[in-house]
Amino acid sequence: MLKNIFAISLSMSAVILLLLIVSPLLNKRYSAKWRYFIWLIIAIRLIIPVRIELPKAPVNISVPNQIVFFRQEGVPVMVTDDSYTPKGNTSPVSADYAPVITLQELLAVVWGTGAVGFFLYHIINYIIFKRKIKPHCKKANIGVLDDVLEDMKLKVKPQLLECSKIASPMMIGFLKPTILLPDIDYSNNELYVVLKHELTHIRRGDLWYKLLLITANSIHWFNPLVYLMVKAANRDLEYSCDDVVVKNSDMNFRKEYSLTILKAMQKTEKAVLSTYLNGGVSNE
């Protein structure tokens, strides 16, 4: 399995590197939506430790396990392994001797420790983040949410909380999605834009997308190109969400959306397993 993981990591590194190099051209010709799906396919391939091999040849040629040597007279004599005894020290190696740990086992331990440690680091950070903001959150009753849900034809209504500890709107929760709003006096138009952005993340299941990226990064924690891929995928995830939100919208809505994003941009800590409108956790 470990050999397959290293082989897949090496082969996919070439693909990732190529995509990162040609990204400027792809950005001009293809929307973020296509890059979003390309990274998804690569992440899935990185997670599945199965090598795709060509079928073996139907004809197998077996080589006889025999040793041929010559007498001085030049007459060949066939001697099998069972009857051949080399000269010199013929003492058998003790069957009880075995190395404490092989190199392959050592590599497996190092890789497993790194993979589990990397994954747990992000999961624990996510749990700490949720506990950190919980005392600073309160239920928000905003009628605009119903309007956005109706316009998007979404039946599932997420929980809406106002949190003084965050600096930008975001969505958390895998099974029970929750939209967090910072303690900012938004206009109704701004709220509509913010909620549509986060509801688009919910509709697409983008938190699961992020979890998939973290899983791939955990398995290939030793590969720096995978880190670059995850960074690019998270960026394209937000860009593709923006494209979906403003699709078929008039110029006024696009302007309002751009202004809202600019308003949300500030130096913040970003929770890995959350979506955010260009922001994150307040440093205050």
Predicted segments, located by residue:
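Active-site recognition of the HExxH zinc-binding catalytic motif
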Residues: 193-206, 213, 241-242
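Hydrophobic alpha-helical transmembrane segments and immediately flanking/interface helices
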Residues: 173-195, 279-284
